Amino acid sequence: MSAVRIGPYTLQNGLILAPMAGVTDQPFRQLCKRLGAGLVVSEMVTSDMSLWNTRKSRMRMIHEGDPEPRSVQIAGGDAQMLADAARANVELGAQIIDINMGCPAKKVCNKAAGSALLKDEQLVAEILQAVVGAVDVPVTLKIRTGWDRDNKNGLTVAKIAEQAGITALAVHGRTRADLYTGEAEYDTIAAIKQAVSMTVFANGDIDSAEKARRVLHATGADGLLIGRAAQGRPWIFREIEHFLRTGEVLPAPELVEVERILLEHLAALHAFYGDVMGVRIARKHVGWYLATLPGAKEFRAQFNRLDETQAQVATVREFFAGRDKSLGTGDGEGVAA
């Protein structure tokens, strides 16, 4: 995969970690960047600055130590509030502003934000023009193919975005009504790529190196946005990059490497959030890492009862030590994709 440009920034590849609330915090962004992502995007930050004093919001706006270019996603339904939020995030260190018009969650859509905005093309235009006009950094946009299957206006929204000065567009191959059910479709993304000259990223169900190549061929997209498939599997970026570059499938990481990556991730979560919050947030990540391994369900029940950082680390080490004994060491056992 060739390098991809977003404004003045040249990415090492077109593989992007999609913004996911409660997932793509700074420790996970740093990890995915080390393991091959060309760009990592922050968790969604509300455009309502009156809510920025919560600890959750403050943690989401820590950009010091983030891999560059620092991309921050904002969400909301008011053009002026989004413009103000974009400006404030740039002052805090954001180098790219990403606008969320793709989240299908009810708590977002019920506030006329996320993919709910696709219903109102005039408002879309107003928001994009306001944000692009408010900052001197590239502004990118994430959308879905439409509101529902009878209202697939992704192509129209893409043209509005290009006219407003959006630098790059990511398109999830489902409508808002689809949520995450069924299979993503890529025909709409292909039509959008044909119709606009800005950078286009395809998103949806990209869970393997082979699928990544098929989606690129089907859409003609410049790159790929990868979200849920990276949960517990941050090495998916290097797997895809290697396959696209060489045509060879990288073997799954051996257990010793999975243990090392997981322990590094645990340590980063504990350091970033502190003992109490770090322990709580680590639980879901550990569950994702171990989901495909025998005994994971029982281990997760045990792990989720732990409330100290040292206990979490020790228990993870014990889990992998037990695996080594049951499987033998050096047998090339890896974690399935």
Predicted stretch roles:
Residues 1-3, 7, 11, 15-16, ...:
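Alpha/beta catalytic cores of nucleotide-metabolism and tRNA/nucleoside-modifying enzymes
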Residues 2-5, 20-95:
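Glycine-rich, positively charged N-terminal anion/phosphate-binding segment
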Residues 4-16, 48-71, 103, 108-111, ...:
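N-terminal small/glycine-rich loop or linker at the start of catalytic domains
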Residues 15-19, 40-42, 70-74, 97, ...:
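Hydrophobic faces of well-ordered beta-strands that scaffold small-molecule active sites
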Residues 20, 45-47, 75-77, 102-104, ...:
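Active-site beta-loop-alpha junctions enriched in small/polar residues
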Residues 34, 83-113, 121-198:
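Alpha/beta enzyme core
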Residues 118:
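Aromatic- and acidic-residue-enriched carbohydrate-binding clefts of CAZyme catalytic domains
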